[in-house]
Design a protein with these regions (language model features):
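Juxtamembrane regions of bacterial inner-membrane/periplasmic proteins
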Residues: 2-8, 14, 18-249
Length: 249
């Protein structure tokens, strides 16, 4: 046997054990990653199942904002008070649905038509200028997900949205949303928002007040109490005209 043939045989004999070890290590790594992924999904699922009958004390977004606020005000606290669904003005429920997700009662967490339109507009503008998140998707972001845009976030958001829509009723989804959504710097939920902006409880909000709160939602920290802008006036008027047609649980 030639020396070249002997060298080739030894190289093959040496490479096979290394290849088997590499494949075994890769398989174990993938298996551990899969187990971790499933465990994370069960963690999300367990929280949503628990919140079917229990109220979340805070959200990931609220906790993140509190850390930021306390950088300037170490003793700062969030304005937040949970109120049950029946103690939230029906005007506010309709105004928020009209403003944020007018197909809320008819979809299963995703408004595909709105998503397509938003995608086309973003492509046309060459940047992200429009979104199409439903109330369910917004709630998922508030409850669980960080504010950073990372590659896995959209996939995880979609998975949790399916869990949310499967385990919770539309009434419960809207109840939680209205109790945790941001309505000012450090102001969360309908009760705190109604008192902060208008000095009344959430159940007593008028149609005009409800429409004004709904108009603030895209950028609530931009509107301290008493501030009035042309955009806010126009947006409020639009919501007022549409809210009577909004379907709510």
């Amino acid at each position: 046997m030639s020396s070249r043939r002997i060298g080739y045989t030894r190289a093959r004999a040496f490479s096979f054990p290394r290849m088997r070890a590499f494949l075994r290590w890769t398989w174990h790594a993938l298996l551990l990653a899969l187990i971790a992924l499933v465990a994370v999904q069960f963690w999300f699922l367990a929280h949503i199942w628990y919140w079917a009958d229990h109220n979340p004390e805070s959200t990931a977004f609220m906790r993140t904002r509190l850390v930021i606020i306390r950088e300037d005000e170490p003793n700062a606290r969030l304005a937040h008070r949970w109120v049950p669904y029946h103690l939230i003005s029906a005007h506010l429920k309709r105004a928020v649905v009209a403003a944020e997700d007018d197909k809320f009662m008819g979809h299963s967490g995703f408004d595909w038509e709105a998503m397509q339109k938003a995608h086309e507009r973003n492509v046309r503008e060459g940047e992200i200028v429009s979104g199409a998140s439903t109330i369910s998707q917004q709630l998922v972001k508030n409850l669980f997900l960080p504010s950073e845009r990372v590659w896995w976030r959209k996939a995880q958001e979609a998975a949790i949205t399916v869990m949310l829509e499967t385990l919770l009723t539309k009434r419960r989804i809207l109840e939680i949303y209205l109790n945790v959504v941001e309505w000012g710097d450090g102001v969360y939920g309908a009760e705190a928002a109604a008192r902060h902006h208008f000095g009344v409880p959430a159940v007593a909000l008028s149609p005009a007040q409800a429409a004004r709160l709904a108009a603030m939602l895209p950028s609530p920290r931009s509107y301290p109490p008493g501030l009035d802008t042309v955009y806010l006036q126009q947006r409020t008027a639009t919501i007022l005209a549409r809210m009577n047609y909004a379907q709510v649980p």
